[in-house]
């Protein structure tokens, strides 16, 4: 198993009772986690001092208590920078556990003896796109949500990659792949 253990700006502080206590840069968040099934006494003061807490609704969705939380903040991972902010369904725009995959992709790109092109589908806020571009790949970033692609562009910018060879596409991934698959079929 690979573990995302190179973070300085992210830390799982405690978990249990269906929740996790995390440090995101300087922000302490409490978010639901259905896999944290054991009980916890919540003795860690961080539980009470969290700047943001997401409350899941029994009817779906939920809401943030975030009076002490900035509207957005930056997180750094190695030589990458990402914008984070509380959004619907407990998310912040970044999945820290995916850092091992960014590292794996970067290692392969840097070891290649040829130019590398990456197609990142369902690319969300672009962490993988930014990581691959930072290592020299040309990237095609595809997500159906215009707001997510705009956020990904901002992540590229704050990572010093505003002019990197990243093609930003707002489209349904199946729509993007259909012409490619048709061309491939025609070529045999």
Predicted feature residues:
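Conserved alpha-helix/loop element of class I SAM-dependent methyltransferases that forms part
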Residues: 96-113
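Conserved class I S-adenosyl-L-methionine
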Residues: 113-124
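Conserved SAM-binding motif I beta-strand of class I
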Residues: 138-143
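S-adenosyl-L-methionine
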Residues: 145-188
């Amino acid at each position: 198993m690979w573990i995302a253990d190179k973070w300085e700006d992210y830390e799982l502080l405690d978990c249990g009772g269906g929740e996790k206590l995390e440090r995101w840069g300087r922000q302490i968040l409490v978010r639901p986690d259905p896999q944290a099934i054991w009980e916890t006494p919540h003795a860690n003061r961080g539980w009470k001092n969290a700047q943001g807490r997401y409350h899941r609704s029994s009817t779906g969705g939920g809401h943030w208590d975030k009076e002490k939380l900035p509207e957005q903040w930056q997180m750094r991972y190695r030589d990458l920078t990402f914008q984070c902010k509380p959004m619907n369904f407990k998310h912040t725009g970044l999945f820290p556990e995916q850092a091992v995959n960014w590292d794996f992709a970067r290692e392969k790109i840097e070891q290649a003896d040829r130019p590398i092109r990456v197609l990142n589908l369902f690319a969300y806020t672009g962490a993988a796109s930014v990581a691959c571009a930072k290592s020299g790949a040309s990237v095609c970033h595809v997500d159906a949500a215009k707001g997510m692609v705009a956020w990904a562009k901002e992540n590229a910018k704050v990572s010093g990659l505003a002019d990197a060879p990243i093609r930003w596409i707002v489209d349904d991934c199946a729509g993007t792949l259909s012409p490619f698959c048709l061309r491939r079929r025609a070529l045999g």
